[in-house]
């Protein structure tokens, strides 16, 4: 990112721009406002802390009593706690849910106890990686962002700690978030871009809660594919089947073949045939790649055909 900024802005202007990830921004803020010296737990450290939490609970561990000595269980429990914290769920919230009608009270209730004990021990020793971002958001002086312009790119979701950082920016900074989205955010479906639309709606709600005006800008010029005009043409064609491509296509050697299949197996078979034809034409196998949107859904079919 730093290299791209320097290339675009040059020596003079690039000196006025700083590039951060949420993690590196959090570290900068913690060094300024305090908290940077607190160690961060590694994955192994989180699993060890889960084990310590269960030892602290002693005979309160009933549902998971058989797994309490299992390293694999402690690792899985640590991952679960990390996911809960990313979603902004606290131990008391999980405990309330455990008592809800239809919930697995024994399982979730005990997990809530483990989670709570884990958090108590954690506060005495270190921080989770996500906690550092949230702590930085809570401790910063709003003057840090005052008058700044913030651009956020290449995100399709924001967890609880990142939303806390965004909430700290919104009242004082001019914030722009770019999302890859094919329709207006208020159109709901389960398509490829539905997650981005949900994020857009969340950001709008956050802005409204902060009393900050929000403006939606739709970019129609395809800058991403300016060096790949064939892909740009394909994008326009997929968006509008009535679109007439500007470039002449040689039927004998198309740059892109768009194939409609009845099943994943048929997709894999067609791709395998295309790869075989390219290989016979002299293209080395190490110059070809097969890319699936979701590997787990296509792995069996691809392995069978290849």
Predicted regions and their residues:
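Short, surface-exposed basic-aromatic patches at helix termini and helix-loop junctions that form
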Residues: 7-13, 167-171, 280, 303-306
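A short acidic (Asp/Glu
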Residues: 2-7, 29-32, 160-167, 187-197, ...
């Amino acid at each position: 990112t730093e290299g791209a900024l320097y290339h675009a802005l040059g020596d003079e202007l690039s000196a006025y721009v700083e590039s951060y990830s949420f993690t590196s921004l959090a570290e900068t803020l913690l060094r300024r406002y305090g908290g940077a010296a607190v160690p961060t737990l590694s994955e192994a450290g989180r699993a060890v802390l889960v084990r310590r939490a269960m030892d602290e609970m002693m005979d309160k561990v009933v549902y998971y009593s058989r797994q309490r000595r299992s390293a694999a269980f402690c690792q899985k429990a640590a991952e679960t706690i990390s996911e809960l914290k990313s979603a902004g769920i606290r131990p008391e919230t999980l405990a309330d849910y455990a008592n809800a009608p239809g919930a697995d009270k024994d399982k979730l209730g005990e997990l809530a106890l483990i989670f709570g004990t884990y958090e108590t021990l954690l506060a005495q020793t270190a921080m989770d990686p996500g906690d550092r971002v949230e702590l930085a958001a809570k401790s910063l002086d709003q003057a840090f962002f005052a008058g700044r312009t913030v651009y956020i790119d290449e995100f399709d979701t924001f967890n609880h700690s990142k939303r806390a950082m965004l909430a700290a920016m919104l009242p004082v900074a001019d914030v722009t978030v770019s999302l890859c989205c094919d329709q207006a955010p208020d159109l709901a479906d389960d398509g490829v871009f539905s997650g981005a639309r949900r994020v857009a709606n969340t950001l709008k709600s956050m802005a409204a809660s902060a009393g900050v005006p929000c403006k939606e800008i739709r970019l129609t010029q395809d800058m991403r594919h300016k060096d790949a005009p064939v892909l740009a043409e394909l994008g326009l064609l997929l968006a509008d089947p009535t679109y007439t491509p500007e470039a002449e296509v040689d039927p004998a050697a198309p740059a892109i073949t768009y194939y409609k299949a009845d099943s994943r197996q048929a997709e894999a078979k067609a791709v395998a045939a295309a790869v075989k034809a390219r290989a016979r034409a002299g293209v080395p196998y190490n110059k070809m790649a097969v890319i699936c949107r979701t590997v787990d859904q296509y792995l069996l079919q691809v392995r069978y055909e290849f």
